[in-house]
A protein has these predicted regions:
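Domain-level signature for soluble enzymes in the chorismate/prephenate branch of the shikimate pathway
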Residues: 1-275
Length: 275
């Protein structure tokens, strides 16, 4: 099968992709941005698309969430891969003084405390992925550049790690979603099963959010996450992203929500695999 992922090779998404779909059995195809990864599936260029959705330090990856809610149709999360994230600061061998650090905005934010303490004057430059940052630094060996990226990137692009595990906390994890129309057969042991719904509440009704969430409580369904995101229509209008740990039939849940006037978009029902 063809698997689209946020590249280039040796990115964290690449690690999640190879954990679920070993490279000796599947064709892994890198794309430069999250949007391009998802669109590659929509254009039938790949069989599954893998994108980051949430980090334990920095929260949701809004580019993923917003695209799936606002633009994607007939595309659902079919599996979730949870990957431990260790951020490394790397450069070419001949760099003695670093003036600019490149990385994905999430990686920069996860490592900001270290940077502020040890390199307060350095300039920070966002890139589309951590691996692309490492690749760019390797392509400019005579520039005073460094990248924040995984260990695999230092190996892939011939860089030297100058500071190890610079993320703010040790327990740093990222959730990756496997997007598609069918559930993949993965040679992994599932940790649990979840559903993700996007709820749009009826306008200007007092207690609308409370009533919607009460439906989950009434059916004994445990929520693991709730987050508001702007509808990008008018100021103050939101949809609510809800994750619930649940493995049973949930059609009755959808019916109960819709009776309250809640518009429900199903983003996925999937097994969770923790690496």
């Amino acid at each position: 099968m063809r698997i689209g992922f946020l590249g280039p090779k040796a990115s964290f998404t690449y690690a999640a992709a190879t954990a679920a779909f070993p490279e000796d059995q599947h064709e892994l195809i890198p794309f430069e941005t999250i949007t391009e990864v998802i669109r590659s599936y929509e254009r039938d260029l790949v069989d599954f698309a893998i994108v980051p959705v949430e980090n334990s330090i920095e929260g949701s990856v809004h580019q993923t969430i917003d695209y799936l809610f606002l633009q994607a149709d007939n595309l659902h999360t079919q599996a979730e891969i949870i990957l431990p994230i260790r951020q490394q600061l790397m450069a070419t061998d001949n760099q003695k003084k670093i003036e600019k650090i490149f990385s994905h905005p999430q990686a920069i934010a996860q490592s900001l405390k270290y940077i502020q303490e040890h390199m307060p004057d350095v300039k920070l430059e966002p890139t589309d992925s951590t691996a692309y940052a490492a690749q760019f630094v390797a392509q400019h060996p005579n520039k005073p550049f460094a990248a924040i990226a995984p260990v695999a990137s230092s190996i892939e692009y011939g860089l030297t790690i100058i500071a190890h595990d610079i993320q703010e906390i040790h327990e740093n994890y990222t959730r990756f979603w496997v997007l598609g129309k069918t559930r993949p057969q993965l040679n992994l042991v599932a940790d649990t099963q979840k559903i993700t719904l996007a709820l749009t509440l009826p306008d200007n009704l007092p207690g609308a959010l409370y009533k919607a969430l009460k439906v989950f409580a009434d059916f004994g369904i445990n929520l693991s996450k709730i987050e508001s995101r702007p509808l990008k229509t008018f100021l103050g209008e939101y949809f609510f992203l809800v994750d619930a740990v649940y493995s049973g039939d949930y059609l009755y849940l959808l019916n109960a929500l819709e009776k309250l006037g809640v518009t429900v978009k199903q983003l996925g029902r999937y097994k969770v695999y923790k690496m």
